[in-house]
Design a protein with these regions (language model features):
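Transmembrane helix-boundary motif of multi-pass solute transporters/channels
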Residues: 7-47, 236, 246-250, 254-255
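Membrane-interface "cap" regions at the ends of multi-pass membrane proteins
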Residues: 1-26, 55-60, 64-89, 240-244, ...
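Helix-loop-helix connectors at the membrane interface of multi-pass transporters/channels
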Residues: 2, 72, 106-137, 236-242, ...
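Membrane-embedded translocation segments of transport machinery
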Residues: 2-5, 166, 170-317, 341-342
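Loop-to-transmembrane helix boundary motifs in multi-pass membrane proteins
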Residues: 10-12, 18, 143-144, 255-261, ...
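C-terminal membrane-solvent junction of multi-pass transporters and transport-like membrane proteins
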Residues: 87, 92, 335-347, 379-437
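Inter-helical loop and helix-membrane interface segments of multi-pass membrane transporters/permeases
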Residues: 3, 30-35, 65-90, 103-162, ...
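Select transmembrane alpha-helical segments in multipass membrane proteins
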Residues: 6-15, 40-43, 82-96, 143-147, ...
Length: 448
């Protein structure tokens, strides 16, 4: 079976689409603002290029050298114990688990796009009740919106690499950027609010950098790039020949950082312009705090709300698509079935899990859909973010650093980096990255 190849720009935008997600709006800006401003950004950049960049190239090499799905690539490349190594490829199941609850959240965004065409709630308590109602009492809306997002994501993946995933990202990623630029221009007109947002994000406070903040930055740098669940090797298997792997990786990382900073400027301009809580984070920042601020602008606020939630929709869908593709690609190649048939199997599994996630927040069924005292939604989030992704990332990095021939890696990357730089990269891959990932995993587990 011949791989369907991305174009060079298609690969960069598809990988950037996977990396740019909802966390760029509600996690990255808050972490920057509350942990030293530009001091945190400098730390984040250093860790991204010292750790995440190294691990990203390692996963890229599995797909590029294996030229197949993650399971088959590991089997092909492993010098011995091929079956055992190929089984580690099933960490890609983590991707479809993530997709199941991630699409529920994108469904909330879809609901808020609809709500943004009507007068918005300016009272924080009322806005909070509106959001809580969607989660715990409005089952029909939650299921309908999740179902619509589910259909959009699976339709895009069903069209394949070129006609589906690449075309989606070539359209959505520039559109996301244009929407953010338009919102930034409006934010500039808000004077003092924009100045305070810029200071909040960019004025360095190095005294805020503690070991705890370093680990937060390390976790953000690492897992914002979709590592550990087979997305990178799967996309890399469809790379065109003679692609500059270093340049492509740098482009993906920089796009991810740029979108996060732009989101932060937009979000915190509104926060500071109206004196809202700058320490708010997570879904509450987006679905409660920002909604009340948009409401204060009247019709202009409605327009801004629609643009903002559409930008989040684009970011969410491109990420969700990347989570479905690895397992679909595996089923198509392994069992020689059609892409649509593979997606039928995956879709049934993902849809059921998504419904379970919705029911775990619904007031009448929450107790029946809990795991170890957590809502099923939260349990899936914990399993994938704190266990599957870190372990998968360690396994893939160890495989490349200790099981692949060093010269094979140099032949792959040598045209794009000098020997000295390659040796530094290889050292970091073998000795620094595994320790860093273990530190992240221990920190995240301890925090839970």
């Amino acid at each position: 079976m011949i791989n369907e190849k991305f174009s060079k720009i298609g690969f960069v935008l598809a990988m950037a689409g996977s990396a740019v997600g909802l966390g760029n709006a509600w996690k990255f800006p808050t972490m920057v603002g509350n942990n030293g401003g530009s001091a945190f950004i400098i730390l984040y950049l250093l860790l991204t290029f010292a750790i995440a960049f190294v691990a990203f190239l390692a996963e890229l090499s599995i797909g590029k050298l294996g030229e197949s799905d993650i399971v088959s690539s590991l089997y092909k490349l492993a010098p011995k114990n091929k079956k055992a190594w190929s089984l580690s490829g099933f960490f890609m199941i983590g991707a479809i688990l993530i997709a199941s609850f991630y699409m529920v959240v994108i469904g909330w965004i879809l609901k808020y796009i609809y709500l943004s065409f009507s007068p918005l709630l300016s009272d924080t308590k009322a806005a909070g009740e509106q959001f809580n109602t969607l989660l715990s009492n409005d089952l029909s809306s939650a299921v309908l919106c999740f179902s619509l997002v589910f259909l959009m994501v699976f339709f895009a993946v069903s069209k394949g690499v070129k006609s589906g995933i690449e075309k989606l990202n070539i359209w959505m990623m520039p559109s996301l950027f244009v929407l953010l630029v338009c919102m930034l221009f409006y934010a500039l007109s808000m004077g003092d609010g924009f100045v305070k947002a810029a200071k909040f994000l960019f004025v360095p406070n190095f005294s805020a950098i503690t070991p705890d903040v370093v680990l937060q930055a390390l976790g953000l740098a690492f897992f914002s790039l979709s590592m550990g669940v087979g997305v990178i090797p799967t996309y890399a298997a469809n790379l065109p020949e003679k692609t500059n792997l270093i340049k492509s990786t740098l482009s993906i990382i920089l796009i991810n950082i740029l979108i996060g900073i732009m989101m932060g400027l937009v979000v915190f301009t509104f926060i500071f312009a109206y004196g809202a809580d700058s320490t708010a984070s997570g879904p509450g920042l987006i679905f409660i705090s920002l909604v009340t601020l948009f409401a204060k602008l009247g019709v202009v606020g409605n327009v801004m709300a629609v643009a903002f939630f559409i930008s989040l929709l684009f970011a969410g869908i491109t990420s969700a698509v990347s989570m479905i593709e690895p397992f679909a690609y595996y089923l198509v190649r392994k069992f020689e079935i059609s892409r649509k048939m593979a997606l039928l199997y995956i879709g049934a599994f993902v849809y059921i899990l998504g419904i379970f996630c919705i029911l775990s927040y619904y007031s009448d069924t929450s107790s029946a859909f809990s795991v170890c005292g957590k809502p099923f939604f939260d349990a899936l989030d914990f399993l994938t973010s704190n266990i599957m992704m870190p372990i998968g990332a360690i396994v893939f990095s160890f495989f490349v650093g200790y099981k692949l021939k060093k010269e094979s890696l140099y032949l792959l990357f040598g045209d794009f980096m000098g020997r000295a730089f390659f040796e530094i990269w290889y050292f970091f891959l073998r000795y620094v990255v595994p320790v860093a990932i273990c530190a992240i995993m221990i920190y995240q587990m301890a925090g839970k």
